[in-house]
Amino acid sequence: MKTQTALFSFFLVLLLVATQTEGGILDAITGLLGKRALRNQNFVDYAFDPSLSAADWRALETLLEEY
């Protein structure tokens, strides 16, 4: 019984260490990629152009109808 308890405790600690390490690595990678991805969020500003007239929108709609 003592051996089973010792093995269970050992593997539980090993699992906790592996989970914390994986979380730290994934957090670091996500942080690096996330920061890089967040820098280029201003591309959405170009999606809406207020200078387009209603005729321009109709022309775009007819061009993209069959796409």
Swiss-Prot record:
Keywords: Amidation, Antimicrobial, Antiviral protein, Secreted, Signal. It is found in: Secreted. The modification Leucine amide is found at L33. Residues 37-67 form a propeptide. One of its GO terms (cellular component) is extracellular region. Expressed by the venom gland. One of its GO terms (biological process) is regulation of defense response to virus. It comes from the Eukaryota. Residues 1-23 form the signal peptide. Antimicrobial peptide. Belongs to the non-disulfide-bridged peptide (NDBP) superfamily. Short antimicrobial peptide (group 4) family. Shows a low ability to inhibit hepatitis C virus (HCV) infection in Huh7.5.1 cells. This is Peptide Ctry2606. It comes from Chaerilus tryznai. The lineage of its organism: Eukaryota, Metazoa, Ecdysozoa, Arthropoda, Chelicerata.
